[in-house]
């Protein structure tokens, strides 16, 4: 009898072990299936800035994850470098000024980059000077402004605004284009130039450190232009339309999320992206971007906005009217439009 009881107990234990093993195996299969369904997207951004808050909101709020996307984010350090990464296959999607796409289209390459979503709708940089002056654009005459890479949207927009305020670049004032984009703040605080254009949170950090003063928003002066947008090689878009659609969906949700939430809530959502910046600074910077209406509320690009950018490029001498790109060849709004439809 005793032996029989022992045998029954051992059989029960073996059954429980088998069931537990099946359960563990089932969980592993589920986890593996979930991992298999997640697609890693290599995203190269032109710089790391609060200006791109909707992107970081999409990451922190799980909007990309909801679409089965895992974002591998890298800082390209300039639009030209982002474009190089995309066309060489080093990145799947790029975030930079559309001018980089326009230049490539003018070269007649086979696998051209195509814009599928717009993130920001005006220049997000701020003019920083060495004194807390009562600023007028005429103050730039006889001075040197660190303006970024020649042919880049920040530099061209600065020159566009200067001309429209009666200051001729390289005539009335010098626009220094020798400093790399990610070195501009360091050059200015190191004593180079009289003014510099900086993105946030760098502009506020320079001001709070006592190295300069924010004088005006370049974007408020320039008007709306498609300042930064997402693009991918046509071959990648054709091969992975579901990835592009999911990406556009996440960005559209994030843009709407920002509209519906306070500056403090936006700052809290993106703070992990800026570990060296405190919450109050991020809130102030977010408010500044909202005040100048920097972010798109929807990811579609307007034809008129692209034409204004091409006007800026033409006035800068980087593009002739004959080199203007066909809108439909450069921009595919279908993904952005579907993203907005899915939110209704």
Would you name each region that the model predicts?
Residues 31-171, 175-180, 194-200, 211, ...:
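Short, glycine-/small- and polar/acidic-enriched structural segments
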Residues 52, 83, 87, 98-101, ...:
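Extracytoplasmic/secreted envelope proteins and their assembly/folding machinery
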Residues 238-320:
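Secondary-structure end/capping motifs
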Residues 91-94, 290-304, 335-344:
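Short amphipathic alpha-helical segments at helix boundaries and their inter-helical linkers
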Residues 182-274:
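Pocket-lining segment of extracytoplasmic ligand-binding domains
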Residues 310-344:
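Conserved C-terminal helix/tail region of periplasmic/extracytoplasmic solute-binding proteins
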Residues 1-40, 340-344:
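Short, low-complexity disordered leader/linker segments with a strong preference
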């Amino acid at each position: 009898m005793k032996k029989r009881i022992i045998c029954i107990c051992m059989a029960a234990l073996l059954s429980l072990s088998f069931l537990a093993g099946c359960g563990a195996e089932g969980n592993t299969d589920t986890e593996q299936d979930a991992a298999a369904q997640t697609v890693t997207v290599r995203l190269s951004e032109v710089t790391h800035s609060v200006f791109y808050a909707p992107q970081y909101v999409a990451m922190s709020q799980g909007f990309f994850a909801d679409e089965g996307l895992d974002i591998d984010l890298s800082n390209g350090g300039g639009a030209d470098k982002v474009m190089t990464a995309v066309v060489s296959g080093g990145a799947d999607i790029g975030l930079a000024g559309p001018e980089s796409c326009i230049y490539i289209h003018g070269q007649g390459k086979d696998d051209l980059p195509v814009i599928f979503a717009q993130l920001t709708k005006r220049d997000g940089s701020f003019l920083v000077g060495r004194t807390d002056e009562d600023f007028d654009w005429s103050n730039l005459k006889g001075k040197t402004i660190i303006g970024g890479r020649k042919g880049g949207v920040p530099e061209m927009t600065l020159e566009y605004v200067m001309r429209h305020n009666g200051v001729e670049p390289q005539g009335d004032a010098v626009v220094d284009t020798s400093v790399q984009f990610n070195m501009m703040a360091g050059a200015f605080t190191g004593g180079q130039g009289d003014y510099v254009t900086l993105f946030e949170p760098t502009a506020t950090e320079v001001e709070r450190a006592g190295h300069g003063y924010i004088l005006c928003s370049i974007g408020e002066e320039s008007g709306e232009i498609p300042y930064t947008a997402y693009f991918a090689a046509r071959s990648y878009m054709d091969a992975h339309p579901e990835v592009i659609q999911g990406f556009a969906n996440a960005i559209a949700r994030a843009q709407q999320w920002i509209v519906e939430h306070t500056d403090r809530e936006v700052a809290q959502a993106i703070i992990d992206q800026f570990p060296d910046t405190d919450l109050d600074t991020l809130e102030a910077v977010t408010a500044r971007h909202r005040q100048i209406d920097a972010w798109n509320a929807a990811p579609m690009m307007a034809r008129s906005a692209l034409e204004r950018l091409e006007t800026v490029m033409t006035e800068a001498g980087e593009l002739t009217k004959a080199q203007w790109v066909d809108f439909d060849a450069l921009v595919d709004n279908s993904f952005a439009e579907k993203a907005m439809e899915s939110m209704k």
